[in-house]
């Protein structure tokens, strides 16, 4: 299991467009991917799992990847967050 935390810097938080792009990025990997904000968790490969968290600017999220390609998934997803959110 690999994970990282990230503080959202996008003024609008995780809204529809980047959430869709994030789901597409996560879908490239076979490992299980989860996003969490506090006690709430969602499946990073499902748009509703991401949007239901209602992540806003300045909030911290934790992304967890578990499975065969977890190292590659964590690296790619962390880069995505830094570039887009």
Question: Positions of the model-derived regions?
Answer:
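Compact, glycine-rich, soluble single-domain proteins
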Residues: 8-48, 52-57
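Short non-domain terminal segments
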Residues: 2, 46, 78-79
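C-terminal structural segments of small proteins and small subunits
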Residues: 51-85
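Short amphipathic
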Residues: 1-8
